[in-house]
């Protein structure tokens, strides 16, 4: 019959199955009485079979029967975007205006007395009055959602027996099987399990992808559905290495969920243990964060695992999985002593990801954390950037040297937004150190000329921070604002302290040389302003051009002019 052509069924199944499933999932969220919203008049029908009215009244949230009397039926539909689907459903599928028997009668639905179901439910002597009231108000709540689902299962069984196309897709590419798994709730698991088994046993495609690349089997693995029977039924016909839009396979998801039995079953069926998602993560990486049992399962598999040492260690650090890290180290699977192309180490990663337990473990195994990345960051500066005082305390307890403290505080103060309290902790720790003589010589001091002072306004406060040598205090700050640096050169605190040692004198000379250079550039620019072309340049460009000359060249040009 033409009626059973796929083109027709695609439309009817969209309403009949998907909408019913969506209604069931939404019904549990209903906490107020049913309020009739603005419905669109679909049709006015005459000579309507009472069975039709009973059938349509099962879904008051889909369409509202405004009037039924003298064989006249006014049907309103709330979803304006799909009004045409409703008209098609009522005219062509239910055959309301046809003299021959209705579609419901043809399918055998008349043998299922829905009114009797409702009557028994409402008039049950043991029924809670609140539930009866909800039914009378047209509500649908989780109290009787199982009843609705049971009824839906009956309808779907009849539809399948009449060769309905059960894998029709909605606008998101979802079939009814997708919908059932998406909306799966443990509280109604029995009804959902029955419906899913009906669909699976009748050949619903477990590999059909929705618009997000999810197959029903992937969804079953992704969601918290611990039903071994459903899993095994799906597995019989599923592509075990299918991927979603992020490249995750079913084995990725069951490993993430720590479902040991499902992981074991997939591996035994030949699932690819080295499949990588778009982030480069394999199922093994997803499973190792949960403990030793899954790790052993993967290591004992017949397939050789592809191990990216840096990636896997960082993955363990991100999840602070110390137990798994220790086990893999004891098995010789990983090595924590790596350095990236950015000179980042495992300890630096632990600080960056605030993995306290992993950091303690790594420091106890290998206490060397005095490394500087290619961007100038250190473990200490990273702890300040993360506002993590606990990690800062443990790092300072390991007694870092001045050699790493100065670059750390330079990196900290490069950022306008930093935790001042954590910076003061660094200053207190550094100021009383005496080994700065072995670190800085006068000749190399010029490299610090842009890092002399940051917290100019905090000098007086810092005097109370147990500072023994003012020059050390001066060197641990950085500054990009030349005007602030010039202000500091005239500050009374500097004038008093810069004569303490040769370093203070050198800092003073640096400031003097900067001032001298500024004067040279200013004078030369004024001399050149007499020329027509030079005067057309903006002052910022003039300054950048003249900055390329050294002091001797500037002096020579001034003499020539």
Swiss-Prot record:
User: What UniProt keywords are attached to this protein's entry?
Assistant: ANK repeat, Repeat
Q: Kindly indicate whether the keyword Ligase belongs to this entry.
A: no
Q: Which is one Pfam family of this protein?
A: Ank_2
Instruction: Tell me where the ANK repeats sit in this chain.
Output: 68-98, 172-208, 212-242, 246-275, 279-307, 342-371, 375-404
Q: Which InterPro entries match?
A: Ankyrin_rpt, Ankyrin_rpt-contain_sf, PRANC_domain
Q: Does the keyword Transport apply?
A: no
Job description of the protein: Contributes to viral release without involving rearrangement of host actin.
* Similarity annotation: Belongs to the orthopoxvirus OPG189 protein family.
What's the name of the protein?
Ankyrin repeat protein OPG189
Which source organism does the UniProt entry give?
Monkeypox virus
Could you tell me the gene encoding this protein? OPG189
